[in-house]
């Protein structure tokens, strides 16, 4: 028995063995799509986490003697312009959807630390969902394979029995 996919908040249980192979195939396909979506979400979150961790790490490399140091400033992911470090204690941070905030060095490090932790919490929540969906998917597959094997065995038995003919 497993919970229904459409009502995760309810504790309603269904007996997978009572479903037809066609119903099981439909549920299997739905869960394949849901698992793919969850995996895509996890991939996106891991990318965000790496971006935040990289930003925090970059802040850790700043040295007090870097004032007025020449650097390359990224305009895009593959295009840079020369620049100079003007103030080592003032950073502009992209917080998303076109908004930026200005923070000092410690505030910037703290911001990225908190973002990494928050994203990690979200990853853990989604990994639990992924595990639940995978377990249910595996249950559906087991029952489906059992039903398909039983159907194949029945068909094989029917084909091996000689046809009964009536003689007049």
Curated annotation (Swiss-Prot):
Instruction: Return the protein name.
Output: Probable prefoldin subunit 5
Q: Name one GO biological process term.
A: RNA polymerase III assembly
Hey, which family's this protein in? Belongs to the prefoldin subunit alpha family.
Q: What is the organism field in this record?
A: Drosophila melanogaster
**Alphabetical UniProt keywords:** Chaperone
A Gene Ontology cellular-component term: cytoplasm
Encoding gene (name):
Pfdn5
* Biological role: Binds specifically to cytosolic chaperonin (c-CPN) and transfers target proteins to it. Binds to nascent polypeptide chain and promotes folding in an environment in which there are many competing pathways for nonnative proteins.
Q: Which Pfam families match?
A: Prefoldin (PF02996)
Q: Which InterPro entries match?
A: PFD_alpha_archaea, Prefoldin, Prefoldin_subunit_alpha
Q: Which Gene3D superfamilies match?
A: 1.10.287.370
